[in-house]
């Protein structure tokens, strides 16, 4: 976080000659240090509700009391995110680090070294928008597989944003991955902030919108036509093989290993 705030302070000085900027008519200071606030404290500050140790049912009831719109597919992570998104995100005008995300919100993040219910993750918000996302990478294959299995349960509930079980990734972790971390910064959004532009189109070199890439799923009939029993089709697609062509390209031994690992 210190690196991030110092970098952005230097960027503001290099571009504008000052750390005191005006963005969308609001005065915003990029002078380090930035405010630090845990996810739990941010929600408590704006709603009075403490998410610590709450079950999915308790969080769902809290959303109802707070008039946060959710549906039955939401797990704990999305319920917390919905509360944060409605009550907190747009209020974070001055640069603010939100830290210590609950584990359910971050399926690829390492558990917090002092609280296993949280993760070592932070996001930086400026002018009510996310600018950076950073975390320590989860490198424990057992923990990662359990997280993927939880994502599978959410997918079975109807959450179309839940991850599938990536057995190649889990197997790679079993060979060993050193401790590491990373951060992603929205460079286009940062450019908007530094130049006080309200539209991303004004800061892109090539502003023409490209059509969105669509995910193609073959129907069950395409699988049964090559001899796959119909009851196995949902399982195979949850493993990430969404088309018959992707299945044809797969070595039988690898598919067998993936399937065995998936069933575990």
Regions found by a protein language model. Give the residues of each.
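Compact, charge-rich alpha-helical regulatory domains located at protein termini
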Residues: 212-264
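Class II aminoacyl-tRNA synthetase catalytic cores and aaRS-like
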Residues: 1-215
């Amino acid at each position: 976080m210190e690196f991030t705030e110092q970098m952005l302070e230097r960027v503001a000085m290099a571009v504008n000659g000052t750390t005191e900027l005006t963005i969308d008519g609001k005065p915003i200071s990029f002078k380090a240090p930035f405010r630090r606030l845990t996810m739990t404290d941010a929600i408590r500050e704006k709603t009075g509700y403490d998410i610590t140790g709450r079950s999915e049912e308790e969080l769902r009831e809290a959303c109802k009391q707070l008039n946060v719109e959710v549906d039955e597919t939401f797990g704990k992570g999305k319920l917390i995110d919905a509360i944060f998104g409605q009550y907190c995100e747009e209020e974070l005008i001055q640069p603010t680090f939100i830290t210590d995300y609950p584990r359910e919100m971050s399926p690829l993040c390492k558990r917090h070294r002092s609280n296993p219910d949280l993760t070592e993750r932070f996001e930086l918000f400026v002018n009510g928008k996310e600018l950076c996302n950073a975390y320590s990478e989860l490198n424990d294959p057992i923990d990662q597989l359990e997280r993927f299995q939880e994502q599978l349960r959410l997918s079975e509930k109807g959450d179309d944003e839940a991850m599938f079980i990536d057995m190649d990734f889990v197997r790679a972790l079993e060979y060993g991955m050193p401790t590491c971390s990373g951060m992603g910064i929205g460079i286009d959004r940062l450019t908007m902030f530094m130049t006080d532009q309200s539209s991303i189109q004004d800061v892109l070199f090539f502003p023409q919108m490209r059509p969105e890439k669509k995910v193609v799923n073959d129907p069950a009939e395409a699988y049964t036509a090559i001899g796959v029993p119909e009851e196995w089709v949902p399982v195979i697609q949850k493993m990430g093989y969404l088309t018959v062509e992707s299945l044809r390209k797969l070595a039988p031994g690898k598919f067998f290993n993936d399937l065995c690992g998936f069933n575990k």
